[in-house]
Amino acid sequence: EEFISWYHEFHQIPELGFEEKETTELICEKLTGMGIHPLRLDPTGVTAYVGPHDAYTVGLRADIDGLRVSEDTDLPFQSKHPGKMHACGHDGHITGLLGAASILKKMEAELTVRVKLIFQPSEENTKGAKQIISQGILEDVDEVFGLHLFSDIKAGEISVEPGARMAQTDRFTITFIGKGGHAAKPHQCVDATVMAADFVMNVQTIVARELDPIEGAGVTVGSLKSGTQYN
């Protein structure tokens, strides 16, 4: 129940990448309460150690940032930050790592390895990992473990398999340039909206016709903006 209450706390304070000030403070507060000394990263994020000082070091990593998504769930622990939400489960990742820290601290005398807790900022914009590496956070780590919540797996179960587990992403932005005019005279215009709509439909043929069907892939157009007037 304590871990669930932590999850509710973090769910209410989602913050975007490298803006996780409140999240960082709350993580430090929880670790300090366990008797674990937190080290703040720059500009956000936290690391800490549990176990013997001069020992083989295992890193446990969780990401801590939220998404620019509005939450409308009416949950009692709904996001308090308008336009931001923990929609990718990083609140659960934080809670899981804090839970592991709590358990490991209680059995610290039995540990034969040192555990480094790594609360990584800014995973969603793909810049946080490089940031903590540049600060030397992984220099004293021999191996690292992480996880990701997955809604298709039943609560209380885990899924482990060799090789790649989840897909990597690339982002694209495309600008279609047309020629403005009036809807009553489309023959005098170059309609960029039609161009964009045609692209959205036909870009799916990359997956359907250009790639090996045995390989997993997907193309998503997440946002399309066009025009300012209805006519």
What kind of region is each of these model predictions?
Residues E1-H86, D91, T95, G99-L111:
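Acidic/His- and Gly-rich active-site-bordering loop/insert found
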